[in-house]
Regions:
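Short secondary-structure junction motifs
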Residues: 41-43, 93-95, 231, 242
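Conserved beta-strand and immediately adjacent loop positions that scaffold enzyme active sites
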Residues: 97, 123, 244
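Residue-level signal for well-ordered, solvent-exposed loop/turn and beta-edge residues enriched
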Residues: 251-253
Length: 254
């Protein structure tokens, strides 16, 4: 079925870079091909690695406009531009929105290795014909002087963004949202009043309930290092009963 969907789209946008030069663009090209070919997959996850810039985030000689971070943002921009143009050519741009997400943010100021360490907040980029244009949030207040340990304050919980997309784009009922996210999160004006096909909702027979992932009598402590490859140390406190811990990556693999 996947091969059949891909085979229906022989011509795509010329804005894509040469294959192998932009991993994200290569993936998004395939996604556009499958969507336009009629594959019914609701959510596609693509990946652009390299943002864990503890060192070499900027070029120590040429300045902040050069370095790994600039290169990554350039690839992100290039890939999204080609993807959106491709969807327009394939007449599927009214049916697709995109969102960036990461498992960590960055600090305000660089460390001694010309990089930044893990931080408490990060920007999220949403794109597509149905997305309201503009910036949600205000310019952050940066302490003077700032140090490499200072964080930007989080303005919106990332679960607010997820709730907004699920409700405004996928049409998930509020009761189901509250059950999945474990509480009610105020939504944000992300998706505009753009005409698009109604997405069916799978009927749920009976009440929806989600059990907490960690019982109150068990304390799960921060693992280290984080992120890690290939191993990390996980510690926890319990009252002596058997405990099972499973680790999943961002693609949901155990």
């Amino acid at each position: 079925r996947i091969k059949a969907a891909a085979g229906k789209v022989p011509v795509q946008s010329s804005l894509y870079p040469s294959p192998g030069t932009n991993k994200l663009a290569d993936q998004l090209k395939i996604v556009a091909q499958l969507i336009a070919g009629g594959l019914k997959t609701r959510i596609y996850i693509t990946n652009l690695g390299g943002f864990d810039t503890h060192s070499g985030q900027v070029d120590q000689t040429l300045g902040t406009e050069y370095g790994d971070h600039t290169d990554l943002l350039g690839k992100l921009s290039e890939a999204i531009l080609a993807f959106q143009e491709d969807l327009r050519i394939l007449r599927a741009d009214h049916r697709v929105i995109g969102m960036t997400f990461s498992e960590f943010g960055r600090r305000i100021k660089s460390n001694a290795s010309f990089g930044t360490d893990h931080g408490e907040s990060a920007p999220i980029i949403l794109f597509g014909k149905a997305i309201n244009r503009g910036i949600i949030g205000t310019n952050p207040v940066i302490p003077i002087p700032a140090s490499s340990t200072d964080n930007l304050a989080m303005q919106y919980d990332f679960r607010q963004v997820y709730a907004s997309v699920l409700k405004q784009w996928f049409g998930v009922p509020q009761a189901m949202l509250d059950a999945v996210l474990l509480q009610n999160f105020q939504t944000l004006p992300i998706v505009g009043p753009f005409p698009r096909p109604a997405l069916p909702i799978i009927n749920q027979n009976g009440p929806v309930s989600v059990a907490g992932g960690v019982p109150e009598r068990i304390a799960l402590h921060q693992n280290y290092p984080n992120p890690f490859n290939p191993s990390t140390t996980i510690s926890f406190t319990s009252t002596g009963e058997p405990v099972s811990i499973r680790v999943y990556d961002t693609l949901g693999r155990e």
